Amino acid sequence: MSFIVHNRRSSKKQFQVDPLLMPKVPRINYLHIQEEKHRLQLKKFLLHRLFLVGYIQANTEKKEISEYYEQLFQSILKHHLGEVVTGLFLIYPSSFLHILESSNGTLFRILLDYVAHEKSEREFMIQNMKIIVASHNIPTRLFMQWHISIIKVPVLYLDDDTQSQSVEEVTTDFLTLTHKLALHLYKTVKLGGKGPGDNLHQLAPELILPEKTIKYLCKATEFMDPASFLSMYNRPIHITMDSDIVWPAPSRF
């Protein structure tokens, strides 16, 4: 009996594994868990993205724009549970750039609210809005939250090179630079943080669109305003089939 016990003890010593060779499980901190949870929640519905530009009424404060959109987002969220809005609103001296990410229904409600204000208020703070690009069924978000920032760039009296470019060229430059800016913010702004603040033009000046580009796109007739965009999507599509022409017959047999 003692022989058997001795064998068991010796076998245990033979199969002991060096602790240094044991596979290490990566430790995940609480912030990483919260960020991953937030990302999963944002993937519950099909994502769409809008790139908007327009003018801002003179003497409009950042607080007014921020409160308007935050209240609008909260109001829409009551009817579209879980469909969070993320994006970036950049305030230039007389114009703006707005990137929005959310569900199709939420984005439509945001545009509808703007159209309603545009019709009812003669001097609404956001004016002459244009939709530059509408991206549908995007795989992932560029932003984790919705941020608003003032761009304080000194006015340089240089030749406006946008006048010699085509709309396609200006739009390509616009999208390239905004995507680079979005990726920069994605890497630097943490979940729950205050965002880039009003010194974004100092942190990444090479990624800031000049206001002349925004104004050029605002004046371009190739882009739709929200009212025309919504009208196009709400308009029923009538397709005349061959059977509609052949049958019923125009006269009785």
Swiss-Prot record:
InterPro entries, A to Z: TEX47-like
PANTHER family: TESTIS-EXPRESSED PROTEIN 47 (PTHR34035:SF1)
Protein name, per record: Testis-expressed protein 47
UniProt organism field: Rattus norvegicus
